[in-house]
Amino acid sequence: MFREKWYEWKNWREMVHTTWNPKDPGAVRIHLIPPKFQLFRFVPSVAILNGNQIIPVNESWAILLTEFIRQLNTFGDGEMPEEALEKILENTCRNVKKVYPDVDPEELLEDLETITGVFEDVARGREPEIEIGQMDIGTYASYMTAPHRMDLMVSSMEKDGRWNCNQHCVHCYAAGQTYANDGELGTDEWKQILKRCRKAQIPQVTFTGGEPTMREDLCELIKAARWFITRLNTNGVRLTKEYCKALAEAELDNVQITFYSSDRNIHNRLTGSDYFEKTVEGIQNALEAGLSVNVNTPLCRDNKNYRETAEFLKSLGVTYVTCSGLIPAGNAAKDAQVSMRLSEAEITEVVRETVEYCAKNGMELSFTSPGWIREEALREMGLDVPSCGAALSNMAVTPSGDVVACQS
């Protein structure tokens, strides 16, 4: 135990990160996050793949993986020749044997092959050949040093006394919340926040608002956040071909676009705008630019024809969709909007019908609102059960730089 703990004390002051096959469509982003130091206890580390799959990694494998990632990162970009890989593996084994001197290098290489195989399988949605443990974030929380995601509200709802969004969504959870109307930080100030997030070992940041594309420096901020898994939440209105190209060049990992309905009138009514066509074009432009796209739909009585919306999105080339109930905050907490919420039975049926369509048509659907649909019903549909991660797996930074438990 002494050697392991000495290694942890010296080497696990920050997470390690690398990308396998960075120029390939099947690239795998890995953030290995060590736990809080525990002198007399073995605690697993956490590997986060592409910002969403969380895998517990036992102590010895975490040490092996740490050394392998550090050696990989000395190589740089480009195709790796065989002799370079051999040198990386040789150095990895030599460093790990300082902690485990009695372990045969061949055993270390076999373990490393197993680890990388599991990560490849999980990242690509395949069943791993070995059983991996389950990670309950609530149980693991006491060993975490920081949340796994920080939502950066880079754009406020009001600016200089004027509305600062290109839509007026009737269910907007940010509208009317005091912190959403704070003054915005400048470019350099947000870059400092990114540095602090990295130092705190937070692997993922989401650029949100308000409407983050209202900022002229958004692509610059995303580019400055390349070390993280980066996501963008937007209404899609400003996603022109040129803008999407700039997002791709900034190496944005994922864009979530809010789309209420394939019915033009319903979508425009719920967004309080006349931008249905621009939003559809934004989805198409993001896909054409090679961005990873998911389309989110907050469900209510007006747009419960969700299956038709999924069919429409399928025709655009969208393969991943998410849906939710109405978040009871901001505008959505007003009496008129509360009356538009679907009952548990109604939203369950809407989701069930759409899940069946998606399963038959090569689409993936996730439901993201905890407590709206019973766990048994979600499992019966083959969906993951959502949970609230506020102040646990995620937190948020307001437009003025304050840290809050959740942006909604």
What are these regions (language model features)?
Residues 105, 162, 179-190, 269-276, ...:
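Flexible, glycine- and charge-enriched loops at secondary-structure boundaries
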Residues 100, 107-115, 122-123, 128-250, ...:
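Conserved alpha-helical substructure of the radical SAM core
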Residues 1-31:
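Eukaryotic partner-binding/assembly regions in large regulatory complexes
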Residues 25-67, 82, 369-408:
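Accessory C-terminal segments flanking Radical SAM cores
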Residues 7, 260, 265-404, 408:
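Radical SAM enzyme [4Fe-4S]-AdoMet core and its adjacent flexible, acidic
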Residues 118, 171, 196, 224, ...:
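Alpha-helical scaffold elements within enzyme catalytic domains, especially in hydrolases
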Residues 54-102:
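Short amphipathic alpha-helical interface segments
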